[in-house]
Amino acid sequence: DPKKNLIGFAMDQVFATAQEPIRYGHITSETLIPPSRGLGSSSTAIVGGLLLANALVKHPLSKEELLVIANRMEGHPDNVAPAIYGNLCCATGLKNKVLNTVISIPPELHFAVVVPEVMVSTEYARSVLPNHIPFKEAVQNVSHASLFVTSLITHQLSNLSVALDDNLHVPYRKTLIPHCDEVFEAAKVAGAYGATISGSGSTLIAYVDKAHVQEVAKAMGAVFTANEIENKIYCLEADTTGALII
């Protein structure tokens, strides 16, 4: 039943939008993305289903049309837009469309990622957020978000040490991740521009240049290891193409 899983349901949406009959078959799904870690596992399933179905229809949908479907399914474009387009996406969903701007990630920027064996469901991570925040903090977050984007465009990566400072979700969600502040500090000491929570957590991500990425990743993982928390570390680069059929 395609309605019982995200991949099948996403495929069903493409067939309906393309006004073509549903194709039935057996799908084997393998993923390296663990659930409940703030890494966009649901978006991965949605976009994977969309691309698979789009490869089967006679008149494939555009990326813009796929993004509208993905946004409707996910409820926001935050993860599905970059999954479809690659790079950094600044997007907002409207009633029947998504406004999306793609910004190239500087090739010299790498990412040190640590995934601890700590599950944080998206629903629970949302529940710890306050209903209201001080106006001053909201203004500061807008300022930092703007600085973040412009720093990537201008390759002024040292600005990320300030731009990654967040008031909206990190102060609240870090309470769900043991030793979060220690990991952030270890990343900076090892050479990162800054670090933050990936999505709703528990994954933590540091922004760093290529020369220091391995050292930073090891330092982040070492904090969890020292506190007897299993973890995996990754040294990553930004994807610049988006999801592909291979």
Write out the residue ranges for each language-model feature.
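ATP-binding N-lobe of GHMP and related small-molecule kinases
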Residues: 1-37, 51, 59-61, 239-241, ...
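Phosphate-handling active-site elements
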Residues: 16-25, 53-69, 96-99, 213-219
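DPxDG-like acidic metal-binding loop motif
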Residues: 39-63, 84-86
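Alpha/beta catalytic cores of group-transfer enzymes, especially the acyltransferase/condensing modules
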Residues: 61-109, 175, 195
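Glycine-rich, charge-dense phosphate/pyrophosphate-binding loop(s)
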Residues: 152-246
